[in-house]
């Protein structure tokens, strides 16, 4: 067999691209002693209270700021809720309808205005869209209801999943994130994002900038436009695999994203406790620019090494 006798050429740039996530981790983490002696990479200035950037699937931390501080995660909680729904409610037909009721409305109390009207019916797929795109707080309680679970059981499933993922500082008391007791750390929530991204339907929803859902009542239908709260969707140079925003007065502005870079490597980012609505996206842009600059420097050096045979 040719692979048993022919030694691969490790000087080609193809190998550098194949192993880029590992090289990036070494390059940015400062574990390359020679690089550390000659030049210290300028780290991005992040305004969020805590943040982390992790290479996927290696798991190497490329950047962190107070990443182990336990903080409320607001509507980032809906990622865990979606995971529990997908895993524990497989019997629920996504095309089937659920009629919004007063309990669904009650569990959304204290959140933003909902577009989902009581006594109207919505498909479970449309409820997922409302929850993950617009972050509607009536959608997850409705999905929980269709799954046949009460609040206490659903929250218990969320916490069991957190334990399964090895998250020691993550806990939930309800599905939306309105409670200050829905908490985690930036470091741990990268694992929640990665777990949610295992479901293609969730990724597809989170990659959608705008959509239309349908409300049904007594044979009548009404179309409702749903926009995504992630302003990075459609931005040039930003390839979103999955993302979720969150906000409460206590948690402040939060954001998590799984982002594919230009060389097809992937990074997971979490930003918690940003004071301004757009600060979390500004933090992403600063990190994204930093990664791109480091990437360009690395491949320029790699190409020079190949050309000069070093």
What does each of the following model-derived ranges do?
Residues 1-13:
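N-terminal secretory signal peptides that target proteins for export/translocation
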Residues 18-30:
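Bacterial N-terminal signal peptides
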């Amino acid at each position: 067999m040719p692979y048993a006798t022919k030694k691969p050429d490790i000087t080609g740039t193809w190998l550098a691209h194949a192993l880029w996530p590992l090289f990036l981790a070494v390059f940015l983490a400062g574990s390359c002693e020679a690089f550390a002696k000659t030049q210290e990479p300028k780290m991005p200035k992040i305004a969020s209270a805590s943040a982390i950037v992790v290479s996927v699937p290696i798991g190497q931390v490329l950047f962190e700021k107070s990443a182990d501080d336990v903080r409320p995660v607001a509507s980032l909680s809906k990622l865990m809720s979606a995971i529990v729904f997908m895993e524990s409610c497989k019997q629920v037909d996504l095309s089937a309808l659920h009629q919004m009721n007063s309990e669904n409305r009650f569990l959304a109390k204290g959140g933003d205005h909902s577009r989902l009207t009581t006594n109207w019916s919505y498909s479970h797929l449309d409820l997922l869209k409302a929850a993950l795109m617009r972050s509607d707080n009536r959608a997850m309680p409705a999905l929980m209801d269709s799954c046949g679970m009460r609040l206490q059981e659903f929250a218990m499933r969320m916490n069991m999943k957190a334990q399964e993922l090895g998250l020691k500082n993550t806990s939930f008391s309800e599905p939306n994130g309105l409670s200050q007791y829905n908490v985690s750390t930036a470091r741990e929530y990268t694992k929640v994002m990665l777990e949610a991204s295992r479901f293609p339907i969730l990724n597809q929803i989170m990659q959608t900038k705008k959509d239309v859902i349908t409300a049904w009542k007594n044979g009548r239908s009404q179309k409702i436009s749903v926009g995504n709260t992630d302003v990075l969707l459609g931005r040039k140079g930003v390839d979103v695999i999955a993302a979720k925003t969150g906000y409460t007065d206590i948690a402040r502005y939060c954001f998590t994203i799984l982002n594919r870079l230009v060389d097809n490597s992937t990074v997971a980012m979490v930003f918690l406790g940003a004071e301004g609505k757009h600060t979390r996206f500004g933090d992403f842009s600063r990190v994204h620019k930093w990664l791109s600059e480091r990437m360009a420097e690395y491949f320029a050096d790699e190409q020079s090494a190949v050309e000069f045979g070093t």
